[in-house]
Amino acid sequence: MSLKQPAMSSLFLVGSLLLAMLQLPGVQSIGVCYGLLGDNLPSRQDAVNLYKSRNLGGMRLYSPDREALQALRGSNIELILDIPKDQLESIASNAGTASQWVQDNVKTYSPDVRFKYIAVGNEVEPEEAAARFVLPAMQNIHNALVSAGLQIKVSTAVKSSLVTGYPPANGQFRSSSYIDPIINFLAANGSPLLANIYPYISYFENPRDISLPYALFTSPGTLSPMTSAA
């Protein structure tokens, strides 16, 4: 029990801070990315119980984890489940592999687990060898979900640095040959593009245009000079 206490305390602190953020204007719900790499971590069930006790309505897992998925059954927590980068090639190359992945990691737990999105790859850079597998893997996973009778959206998670220029409303994707076909797929299927946004890093890299209150989530709103909208 003593080995789990520091990690459990850290999770409780994070949960408490995020719960406080729910009081910010315009915030309807909030989720927490659940990383499983580390020492002396609480059990999966303890982590899910913490989410529920702090009214955290969303979770992201960076790869399938049987214990975590089992603990999520009946929790009503919406889940974003990632497909790791090292699995993209096999899933992109073989529709049967995609179908088996969906069977093992999604259909087995649905509808007891509320899958919101399957994120095919996380922060895959356009220059990486894995980049050419992202879209075909997304297509195969989408087809496997449809064949399994599951209405779950498929997307991928990108770095905010994939967009160049400031403000974001005036930005452009820096590798249109990579992202444009993905955007077309997402638009055709009514899926969002997922982006990993780190406000404090944005502030650190561009303090002239980005305010500290924005980075600390204490700003009542941030207006884009391009759109005059928050």
Label each region the model flagged.
Residues 1-33:
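Terminal membrane/secretory targeting segments in land-plant proteins
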Residues 37-51, 95-108, 177-180:
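Short, acidic/polar
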Residues 68-175:
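Substrate-binding cleft of extracellular glycoside hydrolase catalytic domains
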Residues 45-67:
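Catalytic domains of carbohydrate-active enzymes, especially glycoside hydrolases
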Residues 59, 118, 193:
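Conserved, mostly hydrophobic/aromatic
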Residues 130-230:
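Noncatalytic carbohydrate-binding groove/subsite architecture in carbohydrate-active enzymes
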Residues 28-42, 91-92, 172-173:
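Active-site mouth loops of central-metabolism enzymes
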